[in-house]
């Protein structure tokens, strides 16, 4: 059983939302992702999708996109991104998921290879950009939700590696000590996967080990629209 990750699929949600307006690299992006997915993923594998799944504004409009993902091999674990406006009450979201798909919200799920938890996150307070009062409020709320999700994972008392999903970056290449990384360091986190960064912003992302935890940027254009395997061997 293997673990993969890819985020920011930005499926159309029943609307004309051609992603190539963001650059020619986005042409037929889901077809390319699907082809790579089918080549790599077996039914027993798990794929993590950390947010920005569909442009849909309502849950019913997101259902065809969820069904498209559901037809691809493997089990899937989903996390809400900042553009997932269709993601409302978690009970309703879960009721509309195809078999073999799980949505995380303030909790954790145990797979055959790892424990998965996480939260959306928010814009980090950095030396490059100040937070507004509203940003600060949302950020601290997301920090508490991350702690809640990790605590749910710890309550499972499993020896399996702990993998955290986030949508917003928990750190940057130039700024690695953040309130998020400080919280993560309090727990036996093995790997963190995150997305949100696109285009020129990809260069700001951090990939590698920081204070004993692996971090991997998995927004789909950062991966050239190919799934990333999450290595679960000991650090």
Feature map (PLM): residue ranges:
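Extreme N-terminal starter segment of soluble prokaryotic enzymes
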Residues: 1-4
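Active-site metal-binding loops of divalent metal-dependent hydrolases
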Residues: 7-10, 51-54, 82-84, 107, ...
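Conserved catalytic scaffold of divalent metal-dependent phosphoesterases
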Residues: 9-12, 87-175, 234-235
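Short aromatic-enriched loop/helix-cap "lid" or pocket-rim segments at secondary-structure transitions
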Residues: 14-19, 90-91, 128-129, 177, ...
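Core catalytic region of metal-dependent phosphoesterases/phosphodiesterases
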Residues: 15-111, 176-189, 211-219
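Short amphipathic alpha-helix with an adjacent loop that forms part of the alpha/beta core around
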Residues: 38-39, 154, 230-233
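Receiver (REC) domain switch-region micro-motif
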Residues: 47, 162-164, 192
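Conserved beta-sheet core of the metallophosphoesterase superfamily
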Residues: 77, 170-235
């Amino acid at each position: 059983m293997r673990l993969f990750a890819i985020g920011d699929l930005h499926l159309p949600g029943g609307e004309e939302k051609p992603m190539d307006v963001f650059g020619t690299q986005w042409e037929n992006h889901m077809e390319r992702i699907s082809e790579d997915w089918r080549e790599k993923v077996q039914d027993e594998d798990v794929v993590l999708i950390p947010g920005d799944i569909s442009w849909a504004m309502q849950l019913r409009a997101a259902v065809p996109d969820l069904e498209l993902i559901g037809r691809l091999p493997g089990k899937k674990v989903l996390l809400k991104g900042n553009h997932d406006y269709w993601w409302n009450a978690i009970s309703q979201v879960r009721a509309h998921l195809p078999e073999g798909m799980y949505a995380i919200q303030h909790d954790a799920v145990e797979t055959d290879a790892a424990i998965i938890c996480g939260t959306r996150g928010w814009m980090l307070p950095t030396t490059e950009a100040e937070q507004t009062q509203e940003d600060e409020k949302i950020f601290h709320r997301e920090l508490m939700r991350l702690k809640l999700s990790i605590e749910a994972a710890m309550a499972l008392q499993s020896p399996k590696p702990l993998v955290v999903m986030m949508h917003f970056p928990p750190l940057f290449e130039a700024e690695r000590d953040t309130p998020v990384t400080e919280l993560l360091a309090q727990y036996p986190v093995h790997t963190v996967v995150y997305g949100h960064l696109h285009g020129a912003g990809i260069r700001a992302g951090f990939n590698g080990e920081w204070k004993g935890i692996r971090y991997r940027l998995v927004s789909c254009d950062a991966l050239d629209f190919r799934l990333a395997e999450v290595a679960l061997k000991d650090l």
